[in-house]
A protein has these predicted regions:
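Short Lys/Arg-enriched helix C-cap and helix-to-coil transition segments
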Residues: 45-79
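Short alpha-helical "recognition helix" segments of helix-turn-helix
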Residues: 22-24
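Recognition helix of helix-turn-helix/homeodomain-like DNA-binding domains
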Residues: 31-52
Length: 79
């Protein structure tokens, strides 16, 4: 999947407080790994190329992003 770095930052900014650790717990990974994902600190599944809107990000594993998008949607649509 390809997206932009600024789009990833927008997803991060839309998450409620404490989401990094909640995402990590759900996926069975460390909170630091989730933070690194959104801060552009390279992981094996994350490749950043120079380009518009902060650069082009090529994700080979989208599970962190998928959980983050779901949590952001749930927060936005909470009653």
């Amino acid at each position: 999947m390809r997206t932009t770095f600024n789009r990833l930052r927008a997803v991060k900014d839309s998450l409620p407080h404490g989401s990094m650790d909640a995402i990590a717990a759900e996926l069975g990974i460390s909170g630091e790994e989730v933070r690194a994902f959104f801060n552009g600190e390279g992981t094996a599944d994350y490749h950043l190329e120079p380009g518009f809107d902060g650069g082009i990000v090529d994700l080979t594993n989208t599970r962190i992003l998928e959980v983050a998008l779901r949590r952001a949607w749930e927060e936005q649509n909470a009653l």
